[in-house]
A protein has these predicted regions:
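Short helix-initiation/N-cap motifs at beta->coil->alpha
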Residues: 56-71
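Bilobed periplasmic-binding protein-like "clamshell/Venus-flytrap" ligand-binding domains
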Residues: 1-5, 145-156, 244-248
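Extracytoplasmic/periplasmic solute-binding protein
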Residues: 1-31, 36, 66, 75
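Alpha-to-beta junction loops
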Residues: 71-81
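A structural supersecondary motif
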Residues: 99-109
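Glycine-centered hinge/linker elements that transmit conformational signals in sensory
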Residues: 29-59, 104
Length: 248
């Protein structure tokens, strides 16, 4: 089966962005029970009911409880950010040569958004630091320069934010690279397939998002996928609780 999450929102967020949806209205007010959200979550629930998707151990694909399910073949597919590549090399060495990286499915071939960025640990410079300018310069080099981005791929297996690296085949198809050796597809082919269709959810930078994330990953998704609660009912419940929290 394909992995369904209850402690993360990788698949739901992707589907929501593909549909042009969000967790908030344009004015920033809460809208976690909007029609697009209902459609996306219901699609996932229908897939679960059909046996094509189910809750993965630990609630999401990136945890030690889930890794054995890949090795056993119980989990056939998972939608994850590109940094998941490193987990395969660290925890699932027996699957070398058996795992493919592909662009995620879409609702329609002509959809503007094909994928979104997901996860990752943010890096920030403290503005009050006496060396803030120097720190910002160093981080800009680490995050953006060609040289550093090549090593982001070589060492970490992450998709470099400097997309110029994506077309340098001496880097992306280097036969000596551990990630090129592990996967049975060319990893950067998937990135190039979706390069012009990378979207985002604007709510990611909103102050309400931590509470929304907590609500979905502790209650809403479990209510739907573990307890069988009606999708609209679960989302209405989340909307009410969050509105109460923020006084809307």
């Amino acid at each position: 089966f394909a992995a369904c999450e209850t402690t993360a929102q990788w698949t739901l967020n992707l589907m929501l962005a593909q549909k042009g949806g969000d967790y908030l209205n344009d004015d920033g007010s809460l809208a976690v029970n909007n029609d697009t959200m209902v459609e996306c979550l219901q699609t996932m629930k229908d897939m679960q009911d059909a046996g094509a998707m189910d809750v993965i151990a630990g609630g999401q694909p990136d945890n030690e409880e889930a890794y054995p399910l890949y090795n056993s073949g119980d989990v056939a597919a998972a939608i994850m950010p590109f940094w998941q590549t490193s987990r395969y090399l660290s925890y699932m060495t027996d699957l070398s040569g058996k795992v493919a990286i592909a662009a995620p499915p879409v609702f329609g071939d002509n959809d503007a958004v094909k994928t979104i960025g997901g996860g990752g640990t943010g890096t920030a410079v403290v503005a009050s630091s006496p060396n803030a300018d120097l720190a910002a310069e160093v981080f800009a080099y680490i995050k953006l320069s060609d040289t550093a981005n090549v090593e982001v791929w070589n060492v970490l297996g992450f998709d470099p934010v400097n997309t110029a690296v994506w077309t340098d085949k001496s880097v992306t198809e280097n036969p000596d690279n551990q990630y090129v050796q592990y996967f049975n597809t060319k990893p950067f082919d998937a990135l190039l397939d979706v390069q012009d269709g990378i979207g985002l959810l604007t709510c990611y930078t909103d102050e309400k998002m931590p509470s929304i994330n907590n609500m979905f990953c502790t209650e809403t998704l479990n209510n739907v996928f573990e307890s069988g609660m009606d999708v609209k009912e679960a989302l209405d419940e989340a909307q009410s609780a969050l509105q109460n929290e923020f006084g809307e």
